[in-house]
């Protein structure tokens, strides 16, 4: 199994990245192949709502049609990932913009507008989301984090 870690933090050596690296170490010790992607190293944008991914029978059906620094990452996840762990610090009560843009491109393209909803992603993969924030534990509890 291949586990991809997606670091949505601008910092490669701080809390979020350290926790992702530890998760990868644990997975590797159990025999998994691992890879970490630092989103801030990539030149990409969020979804532009071009809807090329929704064109039934089109060359991009189910896949993001945008071509930029995120394209090879999305392709590797689609073709190789058995699991995906995403990590982001909380900035201004939310995930980073880079993580949001990554999720838009990863999740919107394969979704089919049907009842019931379905996905064109080739298989189910295990996922986890890891959040870090610089706030005391009682404040996090108080605000429902």
Feature roles, as predicted:
Residues 1-111, 115:
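N-terminal beta1-alpha1-beta2 submodule of the flavodoxin-like/Rossmannoid cofactor-binding fold
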Residues 98, 111-145:
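Short, glycine-/small-residue-rich phosphate/pyrophosphate-handling segment
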């Amino acid at each position: 199994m291949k586990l991809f870690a997606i670091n949505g933090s601008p910092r490669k050596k701080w809390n979020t990245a350290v926790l992702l690296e530890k998760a990868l170490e644990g997975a590797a010790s159990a025999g998994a192949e691992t890879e970490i992607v630092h989103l801030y190293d990539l030149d990409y944008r969020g979804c532009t709502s071009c809807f090329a991914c929704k064109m039934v029978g089109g060359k991009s059906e189910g896949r993001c049609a945008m071509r930029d620094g995120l394209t090879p990452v999305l392709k590797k996840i689609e073709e190789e990932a058995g699991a995906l762990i995403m990590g982001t610090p909380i900035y201004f009560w939310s995930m980073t913009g880079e993580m949001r843009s990554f999720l838009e491109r990863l999740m919107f393209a394969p979704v089919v507008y049907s009842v019931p909803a379905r996905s064109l992603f080739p298989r189910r993969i295990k996922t986890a989301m890891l959040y870090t924030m610089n706030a005391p534990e009682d404040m996090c509890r108080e605000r429902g984090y």
